[in-house]
Design a protein with these regions (language model features):
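N-terminal Rossmann-like NAD(P)+-binding subdomain of aldehyde/semialdehyde dehydrogenases
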Residues: 1-75
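Rossmann-like NAD(P) dinucleotide-binding subdomain of oxidoreductase/dehydrogenase enzymes
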Residues: 62-176
């Protein structure tokens, strides 16, 4: 696989922990361990395995040849989606997984942060922007907060001309 390891200023992580701790159901020590383990989500080899097992890099980067049941040759291509991700706030890992897997699809992603985790996604995106602010992956993410169910916001955003799908992490309350 290869790749370059990047030294990251931990001040963004520390700030995220300090701001999240007062509103999180996770005890501060466990929260710190969660944040410390987030780098594992971005392990290159794991991400490459995910791409190959889910769709194949060929389908993300061009046309992937297939053989049909009767031997007929066809091609498939994965198109970058425009997604709204409604994230749960029960663990910083949700933001990390959303960003890592979203980056793999090469789409456009609007992250709706949970009221009890306004800092995990922003910390991760800030670290990515510190590394390369002009990178297409960095520029394809936005993280925002609005109160869930706010018709003035959701009535405008949740339209097919803006986003292809809404991805929801969480329980019944988040889905509604």
């Amino acid at each position: 696989a290869g790749g370059t390891s990047v030294a990251v200023d931990v001040s963004d992580r520390r700030e995220a922990i300090e701001r999240t701790a007062p509103v999180s159901a996770i005890p501060p020590a466990m929260l710190a361990r969660c944040f410390a383990s987030l780098a594992e989500v971005f392990d290159r080899e794991s991400l490459e395995i995910t791409v190959e097992s889910d769709v194949g890099a060929e389908a993300l980067d061009g046309w992937r040849p297939l053989r049909g049941i009767r031997g007929r040759r066809s091609f498939v291509r994965a198109c970058p989606p425009r997604l709204v991700h409604v994230m749960a706030g029960n663990s910083p890992i949700v933001a990390a997984l959303t960003i890592a897997h979203g980056a793999l699809t090469k789409g456009v992603h609007l992250l709706k942060m949970a009221s009890n985790d306004l800092f995990s996604a922003t910390a991760i995106l800030r670290i990515m922007a510190d590394i390369d602010p002009e990178h297409p992956v960095v520029r394809s993410f936005s993280a925002v907060y609005w109160r869930g169910g706010d018709e003035a916001v959701e009535g405008v955003l949740y339209r097919p001309q803006f986003f292809d799908k809404i991805v929801v992490w969480g329980g019944d309350k988040a889905v509604r």
